């Protein structure tokens, strides 16, 4: 996560090499890598504050105030803890299962087809129908807390124990890269510089 590139109304506290973020009331945390092609996978452990957590993707420069009440010209897309999804263009709508502390949310971002799917504990949500489609341009990792503090840990393939919070599972992507808790979906790769050089 990019400790400099943050926005919103709430404070954000980073730790574990900027891979753990405590995102306070309407704070926005964003990743440091953006992609516009390829198929990419990463995981997020919900550590605490599950009732105010969101996991998603965003374009560079996206920011949001009260749960996607945004005047930003950039776009963001989230999977909310109550199982709904939301983008700035519309209200929240039904998508998948709710999630809680200790759950792992997987993000499968397919920029070749312009869509994103979310996984809860290795189960693809909404029977595999994409949460959002028609994505284009650069997109990257995004988190927001709302109405409280949500603490999350990001794993882009470097530590499937999530800083010792889980028992490591040592799954790799199709290139043999990464250390994931769950195996990435077929054809999706760890968001790292080696894969970016080949597939980005």
What are these model-derived regions, one by one?
Residues 1-200:
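PRY/SPRY (B30.2) beta-sandwich protein-interaction domains
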């Amino acid at each position: 996560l990019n400790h400099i590139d943050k926005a919103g109304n709430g404070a954000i506290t980073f730790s574990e090499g900027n891979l753990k973020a405590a995102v306070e009331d309407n704070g926005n945390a964003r990743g440091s890598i953006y992609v516009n092609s390829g198929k990419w996978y990463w995981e997020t452990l919900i550590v605490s504050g599950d009732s105010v957590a969101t996991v998603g993707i965003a374009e560079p420069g996206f920011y949001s105030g009260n749960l996607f009440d945004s005047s930003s010209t950039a776009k963001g897309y989230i999977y909310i803890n109550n199982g709904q999804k939301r983008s700035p263009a519309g209200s929240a709508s039904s998508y998948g299962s709710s999630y809680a502390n200790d759950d792992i949310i997987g993000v499968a971002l397919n920029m070749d087809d312009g869509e994103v799917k979310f996984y809860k504990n290795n189960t693809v949500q909404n029977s595999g129908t994409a949460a959002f489609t028609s994505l284009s341009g650069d997109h990257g990792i995004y988190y927001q807390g709302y109405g409280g503090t949500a603490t999350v840990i990001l794993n882009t393939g470097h530590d499937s124990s999530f800083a010792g919070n889980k028992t490591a599972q040592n799954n790799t992507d199709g290139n043999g890269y990464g250390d994931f808790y769950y195996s990435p979906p077929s054809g999706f790769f760890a968001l790292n510089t080696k894969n970016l050089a080949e597939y980005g």
